[in-house]
Regions:
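Extracellular glycan-modifying ectodomains
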Residues: 2-223
Length: 223
């Protein structure tokens, strides 16, 4: 069965931008353009988006990118990085996104949720980036990210069905592009080795954008 719903879980904007690039991002969902990690997603799901939509948690960001930014005291200091839900229009945008997301969870069509980590280049999540700084091996970092994917899946399965969870683990500054795929039940782990680093939205070298997009089409659009 063809995948009908493509959903970005973050951890930055890169997955949403990639879905736009391959023309399968038809609608907006809550986590498209923000800072997240699996712990945030788990809490938002378990909390039914209550804190997510609670304006009392909103405040100034730590690193102001534009006027349309907003921090969240529970989740991340730069949580809303391209929207400002303290403004009515952006708040209504997130209301629509949340409603659409909840409706999608109830749909019977196949879903692909994507969580991408590029901690070496984006320094996010900070605890994984600290592993880089402390000299942890690539294998140890991958093991850590796989455990995070497993934890996320253990919560997600309580809210929806007929889905795959893709965990993209990106490592930049390699001499050549390569990838590895591992399927563990409905969790797909992609180790993505690129020439350049992620900016959080795209790769610095467009050859890597083409490589990533091509892999996604090859893995998830086979006839």
């Amino acid at each position: 069965m063809a995948i009908q719903h493509f959903i970005s879980f973050g951890s930055l904007c890169h997955p949403a931008r990639m879905l736009q690039r391959i023309h399968v991002k038809k609608v907006s969902y809550p986590f498209d353009w923000m800072f997240t990690d699996e712990k945030i997603i788990i809490d938002v799901l378990n909390d039914d988006f209550n804190k997510f939509m609670d304006k009392s948690y909103y405040g100034e960001v730590a690193h102001k990118f534009s006027e349309r930014t907003c921090g969240h005291s529970q989740y991340h200091e730069d949580f809303f990085f391209h929207k400002n839900p303290r403004n009515e229009d952006d708040y209504l945008y997130y209301q629509r996104c949340v409603s659409r997301f909840k409706g999608m969870l109830r749909e019977s069509g196949e879903k692909l949720f994507i969580m991408m980590y590029s901690p070496g280049s984006t320094k996010h999540p900070t605890d994984v980036y600290k592993m880089f700084e402390d000299g942890s091996s690539k294998e140890d970092i991958i093991s850590n990210l796989k455990l995070r994917g497993e934890n996320l899946n253990n919560t997600l399965k309580n809210f929806t069905h007929n889905y795959k969870l893709l965990i993209v683990m990106n490592f930049g500054n390699n001499e050549k592009q390569s990838f590895e795929m591992e399927h563990v039940g409905n969790i797909h782990y992609m180790t993505l080795n690129t020439l350049s680093e992620s900016t959080g939205v795209t790769f610095k070298d467009n050859m890597d954008n083409l490589f990533f997009s091509g892999l996604m089409c090859e893995q998830y659009f086979k006839n």
